[in-house]
């Protein structure tokens, strides 16, 4: 499937070791689409061995040409304003998968998903659970049984 002329939301959660790959995917999506990044609190604020938060922020905003959504308040209008045709969560940590499967809405990314789903629009999740995939299986199964995931 080739995406062209779409408005795409691209959520980053705290799987920092995969940010470099996620940014490559982000670059590909921006070729023929308008992409806006959404970052969880941790992905927006934490410096890790995989890079400084400000460096990630600057690079992501440079790639997309758009300001990052990084607060719950700014993520909430995504659904009512129908901002995105599709929402991609890449990387999606096991913690975020658990929150989504249990309807815990306490980060900009989880709010973006909840708000986006109000319009029955698709959410694509790129799972990144490091060595915890088996522990996330139950939550992944719950999401697979819901519409638009």
Per-segment meaning from a language model:
Residues 1-124, 128-149:
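A cross-family phosphate/adenosyl-ligand binding-site feature
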């Amino acid at each position: 499937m080739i995406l062209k002329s779409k408005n795409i939301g691209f959520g980053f959660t705290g799987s920092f070791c995969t940010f470099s790959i996620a940014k490559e995917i982000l670059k590909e999506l921006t070729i023929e689409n308008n992409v806006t990044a959404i970052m969880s609190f941790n992905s927006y604020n934490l410096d890790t061995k995989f890079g400084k938060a400000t460096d990630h922020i600057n690079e992501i905003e440079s790639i997309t040409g758009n300001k990052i959504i990084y607060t719950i308040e700014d993520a909430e209008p995504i659904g009512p304003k129908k901002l995105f045709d599709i929402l991609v969560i890449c990387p999606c940590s096991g913690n975020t998968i658990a929150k989504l499967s249990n309807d815990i809405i306490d980060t900009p990314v989880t709010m973006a998903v909840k708000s986006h789903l109000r319009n029955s629009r698709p959410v694509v999740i790129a799972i990144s659970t490091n060595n915890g995939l088996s522990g996330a299986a139950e939550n992944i199964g719950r999401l697979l049984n819901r519409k638009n995931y």
